Every structure is written in structure tokens, then in C-alpha cells.
């Protein structure tokens, strides 16, 4: 099996980007160890604080955020850092080439029940037309990402990443401490009958979205064998879709704060959209390509539909009267 470093060099990835990726992944190994220790390491439970999203922070959320932030701020190639757990961007080296955004632990509600959780990250080239430490550094289209990936912590720790080419999967070799290539090209099947959606939110959705799920569950013969899988961790649901197909949906709803969806564009929707597209799937928001959405703020939320092409287009045609071709 090939080591990550070898694969990246064969893909023609520049040395400075390879080194930055390795920096991020060094921290992922520490997070993986702490996750595996659980209560033995005293990392379970919540703090008394809330993040900017209004969510109570888990202890492991805070630890993972601090580990990633500290190592990135100490990296001379990094100009600015953004995190789900930070109100604003944090400046690093004013001359740094890259900016990095991350969700330190996606699915943090699963921490205390030993469920699926993961770290999502994305890397862009820094902008020279705005202050180095400003939120505006991240006002870039998702299509501009030079690297996107996640580490899924579970029975084995998996890295799924793309540097613009294929979406590949690596497994952490805990014996030697390196990530080894275990799937050279993840490919999302065009058709699938599996769906990742929180059906408890049905009563909050608008009528077109409800109609879609009514058709899906009761009248559409194309999906008469459909089944729902829901991990309460986007990173876990998307990983399953990358491996065997399906559709992840988190529509907007009529609850206060969810009018524009719940998934954060910068460090959740964009990196996962890039991974899904580069695996042959589709990723849209209100019928438009996610990677073409112009961001307006650091923690902007968007409704998300991503995964297998056929059910994604069926959703868009039903709800938005659009095939969202691209």
C-alpha cells in the first residue's frame, strides 16, 4: 500500500501544500487517540460554554479545536485560520500562502455515546486584496479549494481527501502512524435507494419538500425499496454515500435560525461537496451547485442535497423545478 506522501507527490501536489496537509493530519492522529480513550482520558461531557452557533461545546470539541488551531497558527505557510468554534478568523503569518478552515469535530452530539464523529478541513490560497486576518479571506467560492478532506474516527480512522483530482481514501496505520492508500478512487453510484435525512423535521419543511418525501415514500416506484440511514453526523453519512451511494439531505425549514438550512457552507458543505463531485456525485443547494455559491459570512448556513446524481436531480426537479445541470 502506498503512503499518503507518495500519492500526493505522484499527483503533482506542491511541496508546501503537502507539508500543510501533513501538519493537519498530525493533529488528526492525536484527536484519534483521544477519541479512542474516551472517558479514560476525561474528554467526554460538555463544557459550560456555547460557540457562535449557539451550541453547547463538548469537551472534546474544545480540545480538538485548540489542537488544530495551535498547530496551524504555528505553521508559516498559513495566513489565516477559521473554525466552527471561533467567532471570527484568526490571523497567523501575514505572508502565509494558504488559509485553512475546519470543523474540529463534526457530529459532536455522538461523542458521549461512542458514535461516529470526524474532522472536516478545507484549504484555499490566501487573498492579497483583503487584510490577512479578516473574515473576508474566506469569501471565496468552494470551487477555489485546493484541498478538502475529512478524518472519520471509528473502528479504524479513515482519511478521505481530494487535492483537485480523484477522491481517495486512506486508513491510519496505528502501528506506524501513517495514512496508507486503501481506495484509489471513490465512486458514487448514479442511482441509489438510501437516504440520509432527519425525518423528524418533516413537519417543519415547506410543502414542496414534504411532497418530495411523500412521493419518495409512497408513490415513486423508482424508489420503492428506499431506506433511511441517519447518523446525526454529516461526515459519517457522507462517507457511507461515497462508499456505496445514496443521498444526504438537510433542507431549510421554518424554525427560527433554520430558514437558510443548518449546514455551514465554508467548513462543512464546501469540502464535502468537492469530495462528492470528484467522486462522480452531485452537490446542490436550492437547485444550485454548492461550489458556485458566493459566501457572505464566515458561518453562513445553506440547505444541502448531495450524493447520487439521480435522486439529487429528482429532488431538485420536484422542489425547485430545476435539474441543476452543470
UniProtKB/Swiss-Prot annotation:
Gene Ontology MF: a single term: fructose 1,6-bisphosphate 1-phosphatase activity
SUPFAM superfamilies tied to this protein: Carbohydrate phosphatase
Cofactor: Mg(2+)
Family matches, as Gene3D superfamilies: 3.40.190.80, Fructose-1,6-Bisphosphatase, subunit A, domain 1 (3.30.540.10)
The enzyme's E.C. designation: 3.1.3.11
TM spans (from-to): none
Textual note on the cofactor: Binds 2 magnesium ions per subunit.
Pathway connected to this protein: Carbohydrate biosynthesis; gluconeogenesis
Positions that bind Mg(2+) 2: 103, 106, 268
Binding locations of Mg(2+) 1: 84, 103, 105
Binding-site positions, substrate: 106-109, 198, 262
Superkingdom of origin organism: Bacteria
GO CC term (a single one): cytosol
Reaction equations catalysed: beta-D-fructose 1,6-bisphosphate + H2O = beta-D-fructose 6-phosphate + phosphate
Keywords of this entry: Carbohydrate metabolism, Cytoplasm, Hydrolase, Magnesium, Metal-binding
GO biological process: fructose 1,6-bisphosphate metabolic process; fructose 6-phosphate metabolic process; fructose metabolic process; gluconeogenesis; sucrose biosynthetic process
InterPro entries with a match to the protein in the record: FBPase_C_dom, FBPase_class-1, FBPase_N, FBPtase, Fructose_bisphosphatase_AS
Record localization: Cytoplasm
HAMAP family noted in UniProt: FBPase_class1 (MF_01855)
Subunit and interaction comment: Homotetramer.
Record protein name field: Fructose-1,6-bisphosphatase class 1 2
Amino acid at each position: 500500500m502506498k503512503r499518503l506522501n507518495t500519492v500526493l507527490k505522484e499527483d503533482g501536489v506542491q511541496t508546501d501544500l503537502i507539508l500543510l496537509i501533513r501538519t493537519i493530519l498530525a493533529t488528526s492522529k492525536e484527536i484519534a487517540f483521544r477519541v479512542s480513550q474516551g472517558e479514560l482520558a476525561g474528554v467526554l461531557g460538555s463544557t459550560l460554554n456555547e460557540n457562535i452557533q449557539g451550541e453547547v461545546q463538548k469537551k472534546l470539541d474544545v480540545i480538538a479545536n485548540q489542537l488544530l488551531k495551535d498547530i496551524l497558527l504555528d505553521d508559516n505557510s498559513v495566513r489565516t485560520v477559521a473554525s466552527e468554534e471561533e467567532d471570527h478568523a484568526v490571523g497567523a503569518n501575514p505572508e502565509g500562502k494558504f488559509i485553512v478552515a475546519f470543523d474540529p469535530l463534526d457530529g459532536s452530539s455522538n461523542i458521549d455515546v461512542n458514535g461516529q464523529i470526524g474532522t472536516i478541513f478545507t484549504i484555499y490560497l490566501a487573498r492579497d486584496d483583503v487584510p490577512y486576518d479578516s473574515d473576508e479571506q474566506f469569501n471565496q467560492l468552494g470551487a477555489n479549494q485546493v484541498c478538502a478532506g475529512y478524518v472519520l474516527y471509528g473502528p479504524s480512522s479513515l482519511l478521505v481527501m481530494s487535492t483537485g483530482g480523484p477522491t481517495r481514501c486512506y486508513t491510519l496505520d496505528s502501528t506506524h502512524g501513517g495514512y496508507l492508500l486503501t481506495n484509489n478512487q471513490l465512486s458514487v453510484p448514479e442511482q441509489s435507494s438510501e437516504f440520509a435525512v432527519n425525518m423528524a423535521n418533516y413537519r417543519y419543511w415547506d410543502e414542496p419538500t414534504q411532497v418530495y418525501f411523500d412521493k419518495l415514500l409512497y408513490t415513486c416506484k423508482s424508489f420503492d425499496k428506499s431506506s433511511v440511514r441517519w447518523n446525526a453526523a454529516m461526515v459519517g453519512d457522507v462517507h457511507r454515500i461515497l462508499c456505496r451511494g445514496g443521498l444526504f439531505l438537510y433542507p431549510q425549514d421554518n424554525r427560527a435560525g433554520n430558514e437558510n438550512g443548518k449546514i455551514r457552507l465554508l467548513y462543512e458543505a464546501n469540502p464535502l461537496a468537492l469530495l462528492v463531485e470528484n467522486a462522480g456525485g452531485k452537490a446542490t443547494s436550492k437547485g444550485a451547485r454548492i461550489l458556485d455559491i458566493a459566501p457572505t459570512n464566515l458561518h453562513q448556513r445553506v440547505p444541502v442535497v448531495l450524493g447520487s446524481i439521480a435522486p439529487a436531480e429528482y429532488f431538485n426537479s420536484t422542489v425547485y423545478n430545476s435539474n441543476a445541470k452543470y
